[in-house]
Amino acid sequence: MLCAINHNETDRINAIYSQRGYDNDPEYSDINPVYLHRMHSVERATLAALKNVGFHTKLADLKVLDFGCGNARWFGRWIAWGATPANLTGVDVRAKAIEMASDKFPQCIFQTMIPRHIPFANESFDIVFQNVVFSSILDSDLRHETAAEMVRVLKPNGVILWCDFIFNNPNNPNVKAVKRLDIKNLFPDVEELLMKRIILAPPIAKILVPLSWLAAEFTESCFPFLRTHVFAVLRKRELNSSTSLKEAI
């Protein structure tokens, strides 16, 4: 039964992404200003989080897992920030995406995975990064088991960097929002360092960004209720201590 569920979920995700042509669609690349604006929001939050947990000067020595890496859109960013290619690992259920990622970044490590299992040993990574992946996992049990896997492969004092949307898209039944309470329930034993809303609502961004990048930045900055995603920083700790990240993130 478990194998059937795993195969069904993998087949579903592969079919959806294949139908959308996601891996080769310029709409989901930096040449699209609206997409780039969205990525800048995630970049700012990620870089600020790395600085506040003290990882920004250590990236060359840290092992990073991109969970649901797709065709490795984020790997160029990690390398530009100072990460060592050999320390970057990506996993995805989509074999085609992993093949594309391997061709782009041959020095990095890529593996196809099955739902419910990340194919690496306990405490293998300093950072586990997921960007809009859990919203594609519709099954609640599978979400919890996948979250547990992310914690399992994370080293003590390592961090999960999380970005996903918190509102359902009525035009897309293939995704399901992950709200703040959902994140807390998915990671009950991990210390929450930060949870804040980022990314201007896509319908608004599609209007503002082509007209004025500055107007889009102003709107996102001044009206947090128009932000549709949550960026979270979760730390796996053995010590009984609590630290909050700076409000500036």
Question: How would you name each of these model-derived features?
Answer:
Residues L2-H56:
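Conserved class I S-adenosyl-L-methionine
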Residues R116-V128:
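A short acidic, Gly/Pro-enriched loop at the edge of an enzyme's catalytic core
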Residues K196-I249:
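A C-terminal cap/extension of S-adenosyl-L-methionine-dependent methyltransferases
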Residues H144-P156:
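A short glycine-rich, Lys/Arg-flanked "PGG" loop and its adjoining helix->strand segment in the class I
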Residues N157-D164:
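Conserved beta-strand signature within the Rossmann-like core of class I S-adenosyl-L-methionine
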Residues V175-E191:
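Short alpha-helix
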Residues I127-D141:
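A short SAM/SAH-binding and catalytic strip from SAM-dependent methyltransferases
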Residues L65, G70-H117:
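Class I SAM-dependent methyltransferase SAM/SAH-binding core
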